[in-house]
Amino acid sequence: MRTIAVIGKNFGDEGKGFACSRLASSLKNALIIKHNGGGQAGHTVEDPEGKWRFIHHQIGAGAEYHVPTLFADSFMPDLFQLGKEVKEFTEFFGFKPILYSEKNARVTTVEDVLLNMGAEVARGKNRHGSCGMGIEECVQRNAAGYGITVEGLVTWTKQDLLDRLKQIRKEYTERRAKILGIYPSNPYYEMLYNETVLENFVVEVKENVKLLTLVDVDRKWLEEFQNLIFETGQGLLLDQDYEAYAPHLTSSKTGIHNPTIFLEKRGLSLEEAIYVTRPYVTRHGNGPLPSEVKRSELPGVGEDLTNQPNEWQGILRYARHKSLKDFFEPVLRDRDSLNDLDRKEQIKTKESPEIIETTDAVETTETTEHIVVTKRSTRPGFSKLPKLFIFITQLSETENQLYFDKGNIPFESLQKAGEELGIQCISDTEWR
């Protein structure tokens, strides 16, 4: 069984949908696993010949090739929105997507979304740049003990679900709204007290949960597939624990953390991690963007058809890559995060096996800067390091150049720098 994680290297919008779809179309008997975030993803897939274009939110990018999607327990599906996406997909491709879900996947509710949007409005000029899809509020509600799972939606009656939602509203939502500064003047305040909103939500999600097949995802079930593709939302620089860009982050793990845990629970390991980036950097929403420029300052870069201006995300912003060191650093940091998993497991099991430490340092071929790879600790037989790839999309826009602060770098030069770090850089032209 081949296990692959597709991950955004920067702030998202790098081309993860394209990467997942290409893998799904070329690998036999594959399964796409959604493992972080929820309905806020927007992964665009275009036919290689330009005949069609579809934006995936919760349906895996690659489902158009009859590849099934699994919602892992770390994914937070928005079943209110899922019905619309499945309808659009079915009308577009002529068949329904195959959707599986782990039973304990946490469900995003309508009040999570309303609290999220209300909070962003209340923040005014200090918005976090949220997509307004309720992910942070889903996390907070579950942490407070008011969770609703996919299995709950299946087993409860409509009245059971409505009663549960009313309980959450009374015991949690009203208090949470005050904490977030959502008052009567807020346009979302009234809906947080409107019972019809809950009733409509119940009707919709009870119908849409029928689109999912609940499964016990053990190793035997996974072995029915030859290839596992972990489709990751957002990007490494938005990871919930990457404090350099706080509070403008997402409420999920955006790297190899979730796939590694998912696989190790079942006695498997992650074999490949593919980090996706454009030749330049993009970001939507509020928050820092180093080396930011206007799109017109990036030769050849055209308008992005997916990330159109909207109330929550604003306009898509552009930047040059800061330096080669900064280009590779997020990938190396994500790889080294496996050390934290090892240490936590070591504490959990009260074991103290031998630690093997290695330090790597290389000097780049294109600049005088020195890239120092952080110290790595690996234990034999645990958290095997995956092969690392950086997949560069949109190179046709930039004539095979990557845009950096101190000048453009040819793709071939980037490949050489990556090889010295144990990272293989590949271009989208190789996959078309």
Segments (PLM) and residue ranges:
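Acidic, glycine-centered low-complexity repeats within long intrinsically disordered regions
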Residues: 354-369
